Amino acid sequence: MYAMKIRILIRIAVIVSIVLLCTGFGVYSFLRMNAVENRQDFNLFTLVPQDATAVLETDRMADLMEDIDGLHCSKDEHFLYVSELFVCLKKYFNTLVGDTPHGLSRQMNKMLISFHEPDTPLNQVLYCSLGAGDYELVESFVRKYCSSTFPSKYFDYNGEEIRIYPTTDGRFLAAYFTPDFLAVSFQKRLIEQVIDACRSRQSLMDMASFRTMYAGKRNNVAATVYVRMKEVGMGKNTDGIRPQTHLGSWAEFDMKFNEEAVYCSGISHGADTARTFINALRRQEPIKDFSGERLPASVFFYNQWAISDLEAIFGFTSQQEYAKAAYSDYIKKRDGEWMEFMKTYAGENVMSCLFHSKDTTDRHPCAVMSVAVKDEAQAERALQKLLYVTPEEKGAPAVERTYPNYRRYPRARKYRQYMLPRNTVLTQLTGITESALHTYACFYKGTLLLAPDAQSLSAYVDALENGDVLDGTSVYEEGVGSLSPYYNFAMMVDMEEMMRQPETYVRLVPNFFFRHSDFFRHFTIAIQFTCAEGVVYPNLVLLYKGEKIGEFEEIGN
């Protein structure tokens, strides 16, 4: 009996030990999984300094690299070199993945790149979450591919360690490691700013404007780009005026790829009372469909604005530097008269375009702005009356008068042309100052046409009369097919052709595209802003044109 009791006690002790062991293992596993989960949820935006101008985010780094490699432009070796960090990552990415038998951890697939002023390929920071074992993997990888000519150095910054690694091309990479994340940059000062942002809790996520806009990554999106749309440089670097446009506040763009195109679908929540491009568009009633039947077939740039609220539009455009460059009391008065004329007779949209003339020796392209009018006959009578009572400008700069060239464009002969007193209406909406603010006008089938020279009007009317229009062409249909039929502003531009034009004709295209001309000249770019219930939806589409692009020389002004 005594021996039986001993066996029972031993059996109970063994069972209790097993239960305790299982319980302990379960608690350990739970704590371990909880720690991993916490590491997964680490918000990299709490590291980004508040002066960042843009941030690229992905939680599918491997998929993003695969998508980029699948683009036809990548296969043709056309790459956008805006970040040396991304170039290095792309260069060594397959090797890094090869060092991990099961691919990158879920945490390492989460990556940010923040962009900072000045906008150069070296002024970025790359951030990456780290999972279990990732710290050792990354440290080993960095040491493996850094130069052995110089030893790595370590610096203390406010109690945190910054490591400096020499690279094989003679540069130095600054890195900040923790068990949860890493941050690397070619600029040590940017890593110092990352440490400051993290420790002081003054990161991008601590800014109300960004935090309100940020909603986390969406599903089925390769990457998201967050852009601070403040003062944006426009046109070419060689433009003496160096125009800038105040677009608005933060916007986020979800990126998707196919072989022939890159699609960026955006949203901008922020609203204020500033005279910005986006705020001006918010006050307009959207327009429907596109105007390919009113565009000559040789068009390489066009845009279309909704102008139901002219005060808002001209309140914004009148602030542009090129509109104020030659301002005077006389011009100011003419602008006021034209504002009243437009309020009375203009419809709800205006379109402008650049296209090639039949004369291949022309140094400048043809440029026309087309304003829909409510009643063409009444509007023309009002214009004639306005011209009759307008006083002559004293001391106006001498400008050679241009002529319609009806011999080359005979079908434009029956549409009367007018030379207007100097004003900035055309300049405000196109950026063109070539004619010293002199403008030519003509009425054509329900529209008022404005141009910096008479021949542009003739060439435009002649093309439309002959049915030589853009509508139905493959490039045009592909471009508009990627956009919404309802919008407040839309623009399409063949960047190869645009780069050939003088400075005064390209001021509506962001300078970013010209600074990276080696890449963007291979694309047709479509940009669209749609507004609904106070929210603005900007969209950007890059359509690859392929390899058949001729060499060109940029034309100076």
Q: Which role does the model predict for each range below?
A:
Residues 196-198, 267-269, 278-281, 316-318, ...:
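Composition- and surface-driven signal marking solvent-exposed, interaction-prone regions
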Residues 134-140, 171-173, 191-193, 270-279, ...:
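Short, surface-exposed beta-strand/loop "edge" segments at domain boundaries and coil↔beta transitions
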Residues 268, 305-307, 371-373, 451-453, ...:
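Active-site proximal loops enriched in glycine and acidic residues that flank catalytic Cys/His/Asp
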Residues 1-3:
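Short, Lys/Arg-enriched N-terminal segments with co-localized hydrophobic residues
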Residues 7-15, 19-164, 211-240, 263-366, ...:
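Structural boundary/hinge residues at secondary-structure and domain interfaces
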Residues 55-56, 124-129, 181-185, 366-371, ...:
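Short, structured motif recognition centered on aromatic/hydrophobic residues
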Residues 75-109, 146-261, 288-289, 331-334, ...:
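An internal, short helix-loop-strand segment that often contains or flanks glycine-aspartate motifs
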